[in-house]
From Swiss-Prot:
Keyword Magnesium: yes
Function (record text): Necessary for normal cell division and for the maintenance of normal septation.
Extra facts: Estimated to be present at 1000 copies per cell.
Disruption phenotype: Essential for growth, it cannot be disrupted. In depletion experiments cells become over 3-fold longer, are abnormally curved and nucleoids condense.
One annotated GO molecular function: metal ion binding
PROSITE patterns xrefs: G_ENGB (PS51706)
Keywords: Cell cycle, Cell division, GTP-binding, Magnesium, Metal-binding, Nucleotide-binding, Septation
Gene Ontology CC: cytosol
Binding annotation for Mg(2+): 37, 59
Designated name of the protein: Probable GTP-binding protein EngB
């Protein structure tokens, strides 16, 4: 997909702040510092629309980005970050749960994991949570450029088995450095939007 327009619309905390207009939405979820912002920037060919940070837990709101006036990407706060208080984590959890379980415009969630490591318990819980609510998931395994090509299949198998990925859900190996998986990711997103 050729992206000609991309901008942040709103950083929302409550449902009444969500944008109106009925555009399809794709939410992006992942552990803190897994590379969600890099994934967004890489997909839309922008260096810094989604701010990348070396400080995990930076995104604390639902950030809605409009893409080509056709869809919204919704950057969800990173989960599994230990340095925030329990009450903050619970508030994030409620915010994410409210969005995912009530938002009619939500078409799918892109769950981002790190291909170099087996998915964490937080990753597994997130995937199971999405499946419990019947949300389609596209699993993006980032940082593929950090692993020798010959080991991709082995690492992908670990991701698939640890998350127990539903046969209907796609697993795409991705690198924001080399752009590997970018076309496949757009293909999977388009498929979800057109369902």
């Amino acid at each position: 997909m050729k992206v000609t327009k991309s901008e942040i619309v709103i950083s929302a905390v409550k449902p009444e702040q969500y944008p109106e207009g009925g555009l399809p939405e794709i939410a992006l979820a992942g552990r803190s510092n897994v590379g969600k912002s890099s994934f967004i920037n890489s997909l839309i060919n922008r260096k810094n629309l989604a701010r990348t940070s070396s400080k995990p837990g930076k995104t604390q709101t639902l950030n809605f980005y409009i893409i080509n006036d056709e869809l919204h990407f919704v950057d969800v706060p990173g989960y599994g970050f230990a340095k925030v208080s329990k009450s903050e984590r619970e508030a994030w959890g409620r915010m994410i749960e409210t969005y995912i379980t009530t938002r009619e415009e939500l078409k799918a969630v892109v769950q981002i994991v790190d291909l170099r490591h087996a998915p964490s318990n937080d990753d597994v819980q997130m995937y199971e949570f999405l499946k419990y609510y019947g949300i389609p998931v596209i699993v993006i395994a980032t940082k593929a450029d950090k692993i020798p090509k010959g080991k991709w299949d082995k690492h992908a198998k670990v991701v698939r088995q640890t998350l127990n990925i539903d046969p209907e859900d796609e697993l795409i190996l991705f690198s924001s450095e080399t752009k590997k998986g970018k076309d496949e990711a757009w293909g999977a997103i388009k498929k979800m939007i057109n369902r």
